[in-house]
Regions:
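Outer-membrane beta-barrel pore proteins
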Residues: 1, 33-37
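Transmembrane beta-strand segments of Gram-negative outer membrane beta-barrel proteins
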Residues: 1-13
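Outer-membrane beta-barrel porins/channels
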Residues: 14-20, 28, 36-247
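Extracellular/lumenal carbohydrate-interaction signature centered on repeated Trp-anchored short motifs
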Residues: 23
């Protein structure tokens, strides 16, 4: 029986437009346990954050000849949680296969606020985007171990997670003189993930290994069905999604 967990502390410095800001954030990393059900069957259960958002940035705009004094703030919070159950089976002497079933849930909120505290004739503006996610995904893996001699062995493995569209509720709320709230049809996908790795073991006392993974974010789809140009721009122009490589 193996039990482990972890937490993270983040210190972030942001600069731009002559402004410098510091943000501190802490987050729960993971909680996992592993145990055997049978000499050929093992199981794992874990809870971990899949993504997190945490920022609060504000800026004061001094009055000019064309615009009054204003304050602008950007706030983001929330994230996705992942609960998984995995099982591995040794189907041959040297060959094992496994599968993880994960459940995702969580809310992510981002807001933009423009206030004109000293000018009654100027309307303040608030825009808030909330995404609620509740869905699942599957991961598959295979592992093969070859004994080279009595004290030397090599293990190779591969994992694959198929692309999956997340079930979500996407809501945009705006407030100027009145409040409007719209539920939109948004597409949020998790990418295909491929991974390979190997380890070398000497006499069960020394293990050396390496692994590589590829997350194909550039091929995942993100979009929203709306006639609001500002919302479409947030998806189509603000972000560039790149593949993620990890060694």
């Amino acid at each position: 029986f193996i039990f482990e967990g972890g937490v993270s502390l983040q210190n972030m410095n942001i600069s731009g437009g002559g402004e410098k800001l510091n943000a501190k954030n802490s987050s729960f990393d993971y909680l996992a346990m592993q145990f055997r059900l049978h000499p050929r069957v093992a199981m794992s259960i874990g809870l971990l954050p899949f993504s997190n958002i945490g920022y609060n940035v504000s800026k004061n705009n001094e009055p000019t000849s064309t615009s009054p004094y204003s304050t602008k703030s950007l706030v983001g919070e929330g994230g996705l949680h992942q609960l998984y159950v995995g099982a591995g089976v040794k189907i041959l002497k040297n060959l094992s296969v496994g599968v993880n079933a994960s459940y995702f849930w969580g809310d992510m909120t981002r807001s933009l606020t423009m206030l004109y505290p000293n000018t009654a004739s100027a309307n303040s503006y608030i825009s808030q985007t909330t995404v609620s996610v509740s869905d699942y995904k599957l991961d598959f893996g295979v592992q093969y171990t070859q004994e080279l001699s009595k004290k030397h062995s090599v293990t190779i493995g591969a994992v694959f997670s198929p692309k999956h569209k997340l079930n979500n509720d996407y809501t945009v709320t705006t407030q100027v003189s009145t409040t409007n709230s719209n539920n939109l049809d948004a597409t949020l996908e998790l990418p295909n993930v491929f991974g390979v790795g190997f380890t070398y073991n000497y006499d069960k006392r020394l293990t050396v290994g390496a692994d590589y993974s590829l997350q194909q974010w550039s091929k995942a789809k993100f979009g929203v069905n709306t006639s609001d140009d500002a919302v479409r721009k947030e998806f189509n122009e603000t972000y560039t999604y790149c593949d993620r490589h990890k060694i």
